[in-house]
Amino acid sequence: ELGTRGSVEIRYKEAAKAAGALHVDVRIERTRSGYLSLRDAKPETQTDETNFGIGVRVIVNGAWGFASAPGVNVELAKKLAITAVEMAKTSKPLSTDFVSLAPEPSYPNQKWVSAYEIDPFTVSDSEKKDRLASLSNKLLSSKSVNHTSAHTHFVKEQKYYADIYGTSTTQQRVRVQTQIEAISIGEHGFESMRTLAQPAGFGWEWMGNKNWDWDSEIAELPTLLAEKVAAPSVEPGRYDVLVHPSNLWLTIHESIGHATELDRAIGYEANYAGTSFA
């Protein structure tokens, strides 16, 4: 699928080195994302989109330069390499540190594919809809539930990396995230409760009961929702709080994770969320 990458490698390396770069690397990435949502067990939204692009990174006189664009072809790679070099030269006067990469062995022609059994993009739309609808209908059969919302998001990432030292790697990663929500509306107002399944590095097999027991969780959700509706408001005071792992991992990420992300620690933060993940 990345058949032009050999020619792309040659052109971006030649162009960047000729322009003065000591380090050059390229990333070619294709990300396909699918999304399906149901409201009260009926289809509401469905999307299937693919993003495909290339990024070239260089070091010139101790300063980083970067350029990227959608699509991939030989002339574009050459143009991006030259643009990245110019970006490095432009940012050099503002650089506070001289960037020098540590020695690293080369890893030519390496491949890695995440473990999964069923590519979600090979599963028919009707099968995906039927699974979400089945779980939704089980909730709707309870008198505690007035409405349901269900969605699944599935992604396939394919990334190729190469640098001037001979490393070339291809990787593919698949992941799925699904959430089913039960909603109660009445004199009490509006209350909801959702499944706790985390985003997972699985294929569509994640939607069976082998890796996550969806049926059992759906079966107990109406009872938990009814208890939530009947629960009194919290009175001011001191309490022991039990935090479920599905909430705690976000707490850890927001408090400790962001502070220890590499780009933030060494002053390379690109935006609010940074470009690395902890």
Which residue ranges define each predicted feature?
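Active-site bordering "gate/hinge" segments
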Residues: 1-278
